[in-house]
């Protein structure tokens, strides 16, 4: 009986898979190897006390918005805070997408663009990346001209390929589009280039960011959107009243006010460089350039490598069954210790 009541868009749906496999080193979800900054840990009792968990959190996350606005160089009214950037993607769909509307996004890219498009009943137009995983801007523009998508996603840098789309190409796509263009900058801190400064020039632009990656707050679920007020007012209409809990708001605020980010970013960038160099020395391994905290690597037998790493307690993300990513594993750049263990494990398997 229940099956007959389920929405057509949900029938045949598969859960987004999150691995719960025992591991020694978790290098599959692009998380930071760093814990909370020491000064935050020292004050954790005070933070918990001040969070007043017996009352509902600030529904507007005003203090956090102010700090994020300072970080981004905008005003607080240009900031919307969500329970992870995933929630914001969902809210964008709720606010703007009717059943049958067209949504375009790069392929391969972040899986949730497709997931939330399906839930919304949208018509999906995946735009293939080039063979080297760079953006095919001409194809995007052709799709926009032909299908007039109501929503276009650009992941920059792109997950899981690590490739980027240049600013002038983003602007070309925005100018061609009559719909909303969402530029997902989840990995911005590892890249350094942004389109945030263009939000007031283009009223159809939304920039997504997260504190899950560079800031190391994946467990708190704090994402944010940067856009003009005319767009954000509609996201506020469809969000739940208390979507960010008190502890997440306060800890995120404290972490944003620390000065550890630059040092931690530099550490990851150096480890990324070293990891790419070392893996590139192994015969039969193709390593793709990356502007993120992960690297995409192709193997002749990805399943053999994946299982071999798993047996050694290393969990990486297997994309080898995804169309366009045959033979590919995505590896998070982690601590020096974890990266060394990975390098040695791959050498044992392939040399």
Swiss-Prot record:
Enzymatic reactions: L-histidinol phosphate + 2-oxoglutarate = 3-(imidazol-4-yl)-2-oxopropyl phosphate + L-glutamate
Enzyme class, spelled out: transferase
Entry-annotated residues carrying N6-(pyridoxal phosphate)lysine: 213
Pathway membership, UniProt: Amino-acid biosynthesis; L-histidine biosynthesis; L-histidine from 5-phospho-alpha-D-ribose 1-diphosphate: step 7/9
CDD domains named in the record: AAT_like
UniProtKB keywords: Amino-acid biosynthesis, Aminotransferase, Histidine biosynthesis, Pyridoxal phosphate, Transferase
GO MF: histidinol-phosphate transaminase activity; pyridoxal phosphate binding
GO-annotated biological processes: L-histidine biosynthetic process
E.C. code: 2.6.1.9
Swiss-Prot/TrEMBL cofactor(s): pyridoxal 5'-phosphate
Pfam families recorded: Aminotran_1_2
Highest rank taxon of the organism: Bacteria
Family: Belongs to the class-II pyridoxal-phosphate-dependent aminotransferase family. Histidinol-phosphate aminotransferase subfamily.
SUBUNIT field: Homodimer.
Family annotation (PANTHER family): HISTIDINOL-PHOSPHATE AMINOTRANSFERASE, HISTIDINOL-PHOSPHATE AMINOTRANSFERASE-RELATED
HAMAP family named among the record's database cross-references: HisC_aminotrans_2
Listed name of the protein: Histidinol-phosphate aminotransferase
Organism of derivation: Thermoanaerobacter sp. (strain X514)
Record lineage: Bacteria, Bacillati, Bacillota, Clostridia, Thermoanaerobacterales
